[in-house]
């Protein structure tokens, strides 16, 4: 199996330009490629892992990765399908860009990667040059037919977001001309922008050897965007989403989803993935594929030490069936791995505690879960929506373990 064929086997290729020549380049030569990340937030999500896997595989094959952080394009905003993005301030965009670069370096620390920020060149580009030199090369009808723009025409799209495609195209041309980058990677929702960049390079350069490649969007079995928990996005920043929550998410993945995730989100060799697929069919109760997936991803994003803490947390939560079996040292660990809320109050309403620890998004939702019998304090089911947590509920005079369903846990600390 060639390298390109392996990428297809891993379901990492959705679209590609000039596939025959691109296959030859990736299989037989060494090229420079890039992937862009806009700083619309200060953290990536688990949905970005497919891009990081693709970059790691290409780098392992000997190709040279560039990561472009969009300090400038983040100020404009890629058109969303349903509504206009809220504009970020320059300060926020640049700070987010710095945070993303730090996060990416930590995750990909063993890779030789060149980091660039497009604010460096766009901040030097004046509006007249932009319109005369580049604006004349983009046909409005061509842009209107692009999927991201077409979906917004009925609801309306600002000129600001309409120009995003041009800016991303200029990025590709800038990297192609100044750094010799031949390939742009992106999610399938970026394919229109990628092909616009290829078209711009063709118009501006006498010879064009540029290529585009898109990866499938990661979707759950029900077709929804992968990486969403019940309440929110699963962030890679441990301050926004606990590593244990990420670990649990993948550990509890459905059998019909896990093999594809092993292909798209890990560097586990094909032979091992096929063995795990076989095990999932023959002994699904052992969840060997889910364990391998969760272990690999947590180790990639964080560290072996964090992975060990996740294992230990599972032991503490699921072996201690009775409240009195917990040790005080267990809560030192849980305070680190679970989402916890510490208060100086002597009591707190259960509905408020559920919101504070992100087990629910609102008090109304919290009350509904309580009334349905889905909430426990340690192993005591609570059905009173007006229940008040106080010292009677604590262990070691301050710790209260909250449970929603069988798999969601958080900690309240009454000091």
UniProtKB/Swiss-Prot annotation:
Catalytic activity: tRNA(Tyr) + L-tyrosine + ATP = L-tyrosyl-tRNA(Tyr) + AMP + diphosphate + H(+)
UniProt keywords, alphabetically: Aminoacyl-tRNA synthetase, ATP-binding, Cytoplasm, Ligase, Nucleotide-binding, Protein biosynthesis, RNA-binding
GO cellular component, one term: cytosol
Motif ('KMSKS' region): 225-229
Keyword Protein biosynthesis: yes
Subcellular location: Cytoplasm
One BP term from GO: tyrosyl-tRNA aminoacylation
SUPFAM superfamilies assigned to the protein according to its UniProt record, in alphabetical order: Alpha-L RNA-binding motif, Nucleotidylyl transferase
Enzyme Commission number(s): 6.1.1.1
Record text on subunit structure and interactions: Homodimer.
Protein name: Tyrosine--tRNA ligase
UniProt lineage: Bacteria, Bacillati, Mycoplasmatota, Mollicutes, Acholeplasmatales
Gene, per the UniProt record: tyrS
């Amino acid at each position: 199996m060639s390298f390109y064929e392996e990428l297809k086997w891993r379901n990492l290729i959705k679209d590609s330009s000039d596939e025959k020549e691109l296959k030859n380049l990736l299989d037989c030569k060494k090229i420079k490629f890039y992937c862009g990340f806009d700083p619309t937030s200060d953290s990536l999500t688990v949905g970005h892992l497919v891009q990081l896997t693709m970059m790691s595989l290409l780098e392992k094959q000997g190709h040279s990765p560039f990561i472009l952080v969009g300090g400038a394009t983040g100020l404009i905003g890629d058109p969303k399908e349903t509504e206009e993005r809220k504009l970020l301030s320059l300060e926020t965009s640049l700070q987010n860009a710095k945070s993303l670069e730090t996060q990416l370096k930590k995750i990909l620390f063993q890779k030789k990667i060149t980091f660039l920020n497009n604010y460096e060149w766009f901040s030097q580009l004046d509006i007249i040059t932009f319109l005369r030199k580049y604006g004349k090369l983009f046909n409005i009808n061509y842009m209107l037919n692009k999927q991201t723009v077409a979906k917004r025409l009925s609801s309306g799209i600002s000129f600001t977001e309409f120009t995003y495609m041009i800016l991303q195209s200029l990025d590709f041309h800038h990297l192609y001309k100044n750094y010799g980058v031949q390939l742009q990677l992106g999610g399938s929702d970026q394919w229109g922008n990628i092909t616009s960049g290829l078209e711009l390079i063709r118009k501006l350069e006498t010879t064009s050897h540029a290529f585009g490649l898109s990866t499938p969007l990661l979707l759950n079995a029900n077709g929804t965007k992968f990486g969403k928990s019940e309440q929110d996005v699963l962030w890679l920043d441990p301050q926004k989403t606990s590593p244990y929550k990420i670990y649990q998410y993948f550990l509890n993945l459905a059998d019909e989803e896990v093999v594809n995730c092993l292909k798209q989100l890990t560097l586990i060799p094909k032979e091992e993935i096929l063995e795990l697929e076989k095990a999932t069919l023959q002994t699904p109760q052992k969840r060997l594929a889910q364990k391998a997936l969760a272990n690999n991803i947590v180790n990639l994003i964080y560290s072996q030490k964090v992975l060990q803490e996740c294992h230990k947390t599972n032991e503490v939560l699921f072996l201690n069936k009775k409240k009195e079996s917990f040790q005080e040292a267990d809560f030192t660990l849980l305070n680190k791995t679970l989402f916890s809320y510490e208060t100086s109050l002597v009591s707190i309403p259960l509905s408020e505690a559920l919101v504070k620890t992100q087990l629910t998004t609102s008090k109304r939702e919290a009350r509904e879960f309580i009334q349905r019998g889905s909430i426990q304090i340690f192993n005591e089911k609570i059905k009173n929506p007006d229940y008040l947590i106080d010292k009677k509920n604590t262990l070691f005079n301050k710790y209260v373990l909250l449970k929603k369903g069988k798999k969601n846990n958080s900690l309240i600390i009454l000091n």
